Amino acid sequence: MAIKAEEISALLRSQIENYESEMAVTDVGTVLQIGDGIALIHGLNDVMAGELIEFKSGVLGLAQNLEESNVGVVILGPYADIKEGDEVKRTGRIMEVPVGNELIGRVVNPLGQPIDGQGPVNTTSTRPVEKKATGVMDRKSVDEPLQTGIKAIDALVPIGRGQRELIIGDRQTGKTTVAIDTILNQADQDTICIYVAIGQKDSTVRANVEKLRQEGALDYTIVVSASAADPAPMLYIAPYSGVAMAEEFMFAGKDVLIVYDDLTKQAAAYRELSLLLRRPPGREAYPGDVFYLHSRLLERAAKLNDDLGGGSITALPIIETQAGDIAAYVPTNVISITDGQIFLQSDLFFSGVRPAINAGQSVSRVGGSAQIKAMKKVAGTLRLDLASYRELESFAQFGSDLDEFTAKKLERGKRTVEILKQDKNKPLPVENQVLIIYALTKGYLDDIPVEDITRFEEELNLWAKSNATELLNEIKTSGALPKDEAFESAITEFKKSFSKSEA
């Protein structure tokens, strides 16, 4: 087939007419210095703070120090292939992470990349890691309870949806157990949970993930893990990635529980980065903005007003102390930011009181207004009773001649301590908590031997499940305390069938 000259010229003419001259201008720089996960870059004059920088090897970095002649960048990945003189370029993007329902049930790193071997996360939605916290007028007061399933917390230091409650204590005092049990208790609470593991051993994270999977809690949980083997920048951004994922659900009107385990390791990672970036050190060698590091994170937990959907983020940050020193720099910072703290004491833990909650030093500043009426009524005097028992206990060690009133208080105190003990991974519904605490405060346990208290509680819960379902359902649905007669008849009837152990 012959091609006519006119056709060729017409084709060329149309191509020339449609040709658009495009020039892609990319801001590039050069690596001046590299080492310890930090790169000094020359030439990126217009870079933004917190912008992602792309290296020749494809690894991304985060712009931190913006100076006149160079930029300090923390590298988010392996940096063995990055050399002095390498070309780097701006991306024009602030760091973002993938968000959405597709992440539920997955284990991801702080960049949102899956690390559980179950294929890619198929979500197109992203959110910036750093975001301004919700404003004052967009919030509402905390008025809904978040039940942890742990008697000592729900009775003494109640937590409300949208609250920030610190869990603080020495290593090996059960801080993570309290957080995991709280996640397990959200199974029927319509709450999405996010567990952020910061600087933990991979084996520990794996064990926690398996526990969540066995209990069916992974069906409503996202795990964000920056392990001890990851570079310091990953530990630094992990909590911000977790809360960005949580905000997606909060602004969709859902309730979210987020656990930061633990912020001490994040502060240490930030200190490491700051010292490598030559920022001036302050108290305990932390940089001057270590307070802002945690305040801008924890302020993102909120209870939104009804106009914005009424969603919430409840934060449970964990802080590890050294030898019970809660007056150290980072612990005091986080205590001042949060709405209360649960203080776990190693002395109590090793004496068999678990969870090892020190009721005297634990407080919830806003959760009381969210506590259900039934619990507020039965547990109203519990904290004072426990405090006076601790005082009398130390006093009673020095003398055996105790008056009848003191002896009764001591006996009641022993039973209170026993009731507040709880096995790990066995959260208790709030209605069952109300039942046993009512029995305690009204004196129904005074004639039960201390060694039988745990068995009494277990058998009472089993008995109530089949014989007092209406009573339990009334507490569960209304939150109010049923009439005393209903409680009294139920507990009295059960006590007839309970057999005390032989002395």
Swiss-Prot record:
One of its GO terms (cellular component) is proton-transporting ATP synthase complex. One of its GO terms (molecular function) is proton-transporting ATP synthase activity, rotational mechanism. The record marks 362 as: Required for activity. ATP binds at residues 169-176. PROSITE patterns: ATPASE_ALPHA_BETA. It catalyses: ATP + H2O + 4 H(+)(in) = ADP + phosphate + 5 H(+)(out). Residues 114-135 are annotated as: Disordered. Keywords: ATP synthesis, ATP-binding, Cell membrane, CF(1), Hydrogen ion transport, Ion transport, Membrane, Nucleotide-binding, Translocase, Transport. It is a peripheral membrane protein. It is an enzyme of class 7 (translocase). CDD domains: ATP-synt_F1_alpha_C, ATP-synt_F1_alpha_N, F1-ATPase_alpha_CD. Coiled coil: none annotated. It is found in: Cell membrane. Pfam families: ATP-synt_ab (PF00006), ATP-synt_ab_C (PF00306), ATP-synt_ab_N (PF02874). Belongs to the ATPase alpha/beta chains family. Produces ATP from ADP in the presence of a proton gradient across the membrane. The alpha chain is a regulatory subunit. F-type ATPases have 2 components, CF(1) - the catalytic core - and CF(0) - the membrane proton channel. CF(1) has five subunits: alpha(3), beta(3), gamma(1), delta(1), epsilon(1). CF(0) has three main subunits: a(1), b(2) and c(9-12). The alpha and beta chains form an alternating ring which encloses part of the gamma chain. CF(1) is attached to CF(0) by a central stalk formed by the gamma and epsilon chains, while a peripheral stalk is formed by the delta and b chains. PANTHER family: ATP SYNTHASE SUBUNIT ALPHA, MITOCHONDRIAL. This is ATP synthase subunit alpha. It comes from Staphylococcus saprophyticus subsp. saprophyticus (strain ATCC 15305 / DSM 20229 / NCIMB 8711 / NCTC 7292 / S-41). The lineage of its organism: Bacteria, Bacillati, Bacillota, Bacilli, Bacillales.
